[in-house]
Structure formats: structure tokens, C-alpha cells
Amino acid sequence: MPKLQSPMSNSNVFCPFRRKNVALTPEEYVRQNFLRQLVEQHHYPASLIAVEKALPPIQQTSGNTHRKRADAIVYSSSMLPLMIIEFKADSVPLTRKTLDQIAVYNTQLNVPYLVLHNGRETVIARVQDSQITFLDQLPEWNQLSH
């Protein structure tokens, strides 16, 4: 995967996961660099990473349905979701609200790993039996339960 340059206005980048050119926004810059790291350094198969993946509709208390997209989902070799990743631009802090957002996605997917990343910091959580444990480092591909 080619190394990305810093985002500039009116720039596009080829996303190998979506197989198309996309606008190189600050969030996209963070996304592409982190996903490249997953593949190159942590040995995650690129073919098992879905980007901007539509989630099943969420039924809200008002009765309306709300459609969401996960920034990235890592799947097992048997196509079970293992990890949800939420990206923010490097100027956006990771907050409890960001964690709550990804936790809502996880009510639908029930994955064992949640990751938040903004280019400067990464929050990695292991979810097991409704308990969240924060991890110091990203698990290698061969450490995931798959």
C-alpha cells in the first residue's frame, strides 16, 4: 500500500478496501494510515476489512429507524465480525461520546474488540461478557479469536 501524504484540499486517494478514489479528508487520512498499519504491521488480511460498512437499521424509541455506517469492520476468516473501528480526524479528541457511538454499533454486531483512533491516540477495548477491558496495544491478527 502506498504511503499517504498529508491531506490537502481537493485531493483524492485510492482506497484499496473500497476499490475506488475517495476525498482525502483529515479523517480519511487517519483511516488509510491506520488500516495500512493493520495490514502491514499487525498482519490483518486486507480482504477481511470492510470500510464504511452499512449496519442494520437501528430502531429508535421514537419508532423511527436510523441507518448508520461503521468506519471499518474487521472480519474473521469465516466472515464473523471481530472488530469495529471508529476514526476521527486528528483534530477531534476521543471522548466518552465517541466510545458510546461505537458501543451502540456493537449492540448490533457484538464484536469482541472496539477501536477508536484519531491519528494521535488510540483506544482499544476488549468486550467480553458485557465487560469492557481497555488494552495497551492492538492485538496481532493471530491473537484475535477467529
Locations of regions flagged by a protein language model:
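A short, conserved, highly charged catalytic patch centered on acidic carboxylates
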Residues: 1-113, 120-146
